Amino acid sequence: MLGDRVRATRYFAYSGEVAIAALVVAVIGLMILPLPTPMIDTLLGINITLSVVLLMVTMYVPDSISLSSFPSLLLFTTLLRLSLNIASTKSILLHAEAGHIIESFGELVVGGNLVVGLVVFLIITTVQFIVIAKGSERVAEVGARFTLDAMPGKQMSIDADLRGGNLTADEARRKRARLAMESQLHGGMDGAMKFVKGDAIAGLVITMVNILAGIVVGVTYHGMTAGDAANRFAILSVGDAMVSQIASLLISVAAGVMITRVANENETRLSSLGLDIGRQLTSNARALMAASVLLACFAFVPGFPAVLFLLLAAAVGAGGYTIWRKQRDISGTDQRKLPSASRKGAKGEAPHIRKNAPDFASPLSMRLSPQLAALLDPARLDQAIESERRQLVELLGLPFPGIAIWQTESLQGMQYEVLIHDVPETRAELENTDDMQAALARQAISPLHARAHLFVGIQETQWMLEQVAVDYPGLVAEVNKAMPAQRIADVLRRLLEERIPVRNIKSILESLVVWGPKEKDLLMLTEYVRCDLGRYLAHTATAGTGQLPAVMLDHAVEQLIRQSIRATAAGNFLALPPEQANQLVEQVERIVGDHAQHPLAVVASMDVRRYVRRMIEARLTWLQVYSFQELGSEVQLQPIGRVVV
């Protein structure tokens, strides 16, 4: 199948090359050689066919770049028409005939009245020259100038996207090639429109010359009277001019359509001018209804055909009403949607409360009982989720992972269940109150605060890097060279695991650029990043007071922990015997129990801090563990107890 397509493409491409070469030879031959009238009829038919085909093609191309050969086509079709004018002029003046097409056009337009025929011809020529050709020429000039003026900015935008990682090298190369083709096309169209304008002028001059010369030739060489010569040669001259002008008019319209086409970024290869016009004209139902009322008013104007305008008003009004109903249905569907429940940076349709579970597990999801789902107000729930999202970003800087909500028959009454990666986190029953939407949103988003590290992966990290690259493209480029996105995500996860926000992503990335190439151990790399965030950690630990009541570790305890660290291929871990670990944790519990105050923390050396935190987090989740290095000299420690062996 693919081979057949390739062969067909090559065949048509080869045929196109032969056709263009034959056209150039034919143009030269038409200017020199006399042609029989059947051949003139054939060539005139081909000329009209080319004009119609070209007009239809311009109506269906999605953008002007898709027909980049259009300026050359304008040149060739103009030369073909002018050469046909020369050939038909020779036939008219030499033989007083030029084939059936020209004579039929002449008799049809003239209609037995030479004055009427000339007036019709002049009107068509004027419309083409003053309205279509002149307007298209102006649009081509402005389009060429604006395209050339905008080119440096577009090139800089492509370079910035390439540096920021938004484009690959191949994509950037294609965009630059398309930009160059676009500038060449508009420049070519600016010049090619001069051919169209000149063709209209030439057609008018040739017709006048043909009529005057025809009268002279008819009287002098054919023995006709002046009246017969004027009638005969006027019919042929006007017919010749009309054949050329009709084809020229179609080409002018095609050129106008081509250069006035405005393509948007959402168009596909199947887009066309007709689809765009139909979609845009029928996008506003109120406009159609207003037009229907105005048409109905015309029906009551004295002398106007009332039935006609009433029928038109009814047709337009019916169309407007149909569009309004569709928009209302879509609006009703949109009101049931929850845009705030979508993932940060997600594209496509907004989520809604589904009837069934989604095909794949979501990072965060909620199941509702049918009774609870029926009582919820989607608009108020959307506002509540949006409020919780803003708080999440403000507190942690975490991109919202999205939440999938659906009904299930396994829950009864007003029950709901929150799941993290399809694992149930909480199940409760909601009271039917005025603020139940806010309560439900709060319960749904709360796992993001407690387990934020579970919602950061490569995709979220990549999205954060793309956002930072808008303002700091150089920094993102350096951190991408220093380490892969997966390693950056690991560091962010470990920070969030200890409730350290990633809002200050710029400082985190700068720290990774410095320490990433030097430190291969992920735990120590995270400790270095924490040290670079020391100013923030010191402020948070002391609540802005500069003083921190602290549980200290004896040197022997720290040495015991260091000796119990085991290195494996999967990473380092603490191999402290359970009874010793339990004794140490109990000492910490006794100390903090006697000094219940806030702020309060455990302070240890940087190399053992993480293992101390891991040891106590199961029983003292709220208690933070800091290192001396990250707190620095600005924090005044107030020891409240010491853990010993």
Curated annotation (Swiss-Prot):
List the Pfam families hit by this protein, alphabetically.
FHIPEP (PF00771)
Question: Which GO biological process annotations does it have?
Answer: protein secretion; symbiont-mediated perturbation of host programmed cell death
Q: Which UniProt keywords apply?
A: Cell inner membrane, Cell membrane, Hypersensitive response elicitation, Membrane, Protein transport, Transmembrane, Transmembrane helix, Transport
Q: Which domain of life is it from?
A: Bacteria
- What is the first-listed, main subcellular location in coarse terms? membrane
* Region of interest (Disordered), residue spans: 334-354
A GO cellular component annotation here is: plasma membrane
Q: Subcellular localization, per the record?
A: Cell inner membrane
Membrane topology note = Multi-pass membrane protein
- Where does this protein have coiled-coil stretches? none
- Looking at the UniProt entry, the stretches that span the membrane are 18-34, 43-59, 108-124, 201-217, 243-259, 285-301, 308-324
For this protein, the record's PANTHER family field holds: FLAGELLAR EXPORT PROTEIN, MEMBRANE FLHA SUBUNIT-RELATED (PTHR30161), INVASION PROTEIN INVA (PTHR30161:SF2)
Family that this chain belongs to: Belongs to the FHIPEP (flagella/HR/invasion proteins export pore) family.
Biological role:
Involved in the secretion of a proteinaceous elicitor of the hypersensitivity response in plants.
Q: What is this protein called?
A: Protein hrpC2
Q: Which organism is it from?
A: Xanthomonas euvesicatoria
Gene that this sequence comes from? hrpC2
